[in-house]
Amino acid sequence: MSNQPNRIIIFDTTLRDGEQSPGATLNGDEKLTVARALARLGVDVIEAGFPYASPGDFEAVQQIAKVVGVEGGPSICGLARATKADIAKAAEALKPAAKPRIHTFLATSDIHLAYKLKKTRQEVLEIVPEMVAYAKSFVDDVEFSPEDAGRSDPEFLYQVLERAIAAGATTVNIPDTVGYLTPSEFGQLIRGIKENVPNIDQAIISVHGHNDLGLAVANFLEAVKNGARQLECTINGIGERAGNAALEELVMALHVRRQYYNPFLGRPVDSTEPLTNINTKEIYKTSRLVSNLTGMAVQPNKAIVGANAFAHESGIHQDGVLKNKLTYEIMDAESIGLTNNQIVLGKLSGRHAFSTRLKELGFELSETDLNKAFLRFKEVADKKKEITDWDLEAIVNDEIQQAPEVFRLELVQVSCGDQARPTATVILRGPEGQELMDAAIGTGPVDAVYKAINRVVNVPNQLIEFSVKSVTAGIDAMGEVTIRLKYENRIFSGHAANTDIIVASARAYISALNRLYAAIEQEKAEKEKAAVTSAS
């Protein structure tokens, strides 16, 4: 990787910064699934996590480094504070990767120095080169971030960056940590760094930003014009508070407006060479995967991947699009992998046809998972005459991409009507395989189901979000249910799809409860381990 590439490096931090969204916590297997999808998408760098943060994060980074960080694959990055313990832990987790990167950071704004770090500027100027050099002793590829660079004194920032590069940093990342800057300010910040850091040509300038004012993508594009060559982003823009810059928006902006951005990368205006390595046809699929696994629904009017991104309500617009798509569409839906809602299978379709179509859609399933998905497909096909690609996607997401089952739904029955009190009966299979049954009355059928499940499971929680949407059109369409539960200060999400919305609601609730229960059990195990360690 040259220090000044003539293309844009895409650094995906969905598994690190994106996972910090409330309720977006993923287990190790889910993180690996996302990492594989990011590799297929073509991202250059995957920030897999923060190895020092927890044993679970360490194991996830290590597994991703081993399975996804192979020769010819993406660089695998681990985050570390500017301490030797953090950096050593990151290096250990990244050992299996063919192209490991350690990303270390230290705040440089006066407010962070005074209130968080309680350090002087001189101390920071000494710590940064020492820690970058320490990281360099483990890996060749080191990234340094001056946290809250957007609110740092520019002259001090230049000194910090110069010392970081001199100590071996190959990438210097400029974060707008609180999403405060405007595009012109961000562009000036990058230009100032290009002009005032003497050794800046020895490192790639990266940018990282949050969307608190809705300006993250605009800021990044302005940064590209002023010399930034790496963009740190997340799928669907997920992340803390208002989120991060959205990968799909950045990539498609650079793709659609290539002629505009070509000169800023030293290319002829009419160059047709892509500005990124991203396979854009994988964008929609990856967006759906992340949405399903995190339980964070994509808003319908979200640019690029929202349900309405290629929909036209106005009669004038519809007429124009039918005559020529370019009248009201600046990109083709197929360019992001959004295929027509084509009918492909039915109840007479066999396992081979089912398996073949899933492979065409990009799903690589093990024999066990394929069998599970096929049984579910047959179940849906008996109730739904025509099975579309979107139905197949929903089936795979619902059947395979779920939290490990501690509780399993065996039966749900409801009785309701305008003259009857909604009543639900549920039968679950518990952690030891025991049958658990109960019934409850609610204000509606879903409320009754959830109350019955709560009586059986007995895990305290608060339902804070419940949403339903149709997968496809038609009266027999599958419905997708996404819910979010709150337990103490943590949020857990669940997702399920079914032609029966009550069944989908029950399965989504069980999915979220399984995540919650697993987290409680893990906390118990860690406390017991800590108690044993302290006793010995």
Swiss-Prot record:
Record-listed Mn(2+) binding positions: 17, 208, 210, 244
Residue ranges, annotated region (Regulatory domain): 408-536
Subunit record text: Homodimer.
Family under the similarity heading: Belongs to the alpha-IPM synthase/homocitrate synthase family. LeuA type 1 subfamily.
NCBIfam families named in the record: leuA_bact, PRK00915.1-3
Record-linked InterPro entries: 2-IPM_HCS-like, 2-isopropylmalate_synth_dimer, AIPM/Hcit_synth_CS, Aldolase_TIM, LeuA/HCS_post-cat, LeuA_allosteric_dom_sf, LeuA_bact_synth, PYR_CT
Localization, UniProt: Cytoplasm
Pathway assignment: Amino-acid biosynthesis; L-leucine biosynthesis; L-leucine from 3-methyl-2-oxobutanoate: step 1/4
Cofactor(s) demanded: Mn(2+)
GO MF annotation: an example: 2-isopropylmalate synthase activity
GO CC field: cytoplasm
Catalysed reaction, written as an equation: 3-methyl-2-oxobutanoate + acetyl-CoA + H2O = (2S)-2-isopropylmalate + CoA + H(+)
Enzyme class (EC, first level): transferase
GO annotation terms (biological process): L-leucine biosynthetic process
Keyword annotations from UniProtKB, A to Z: Amino-acid biosynthesis, Branched-chain amino acid biosynthesis, Cytoplasm, Leucine biosynthesis, Manganese, Metal-binding, Transferase
Keyword Metal-binding attributed: yes
Disulfide-linked positions: none
Domain of life: Bacteria
Gene: leuA
Protein name stated in the entry: 2-isopropylmalate synthase
Function of the protein: Catalyzes the condensation of the acetyl group of acetyl-CoA with 3-methyl-2-oxobutanoate (2-ketoisovalerate) to form 3-carboxy-3-hydroxy-4-methylpentanoate (2-isopropylmalate).
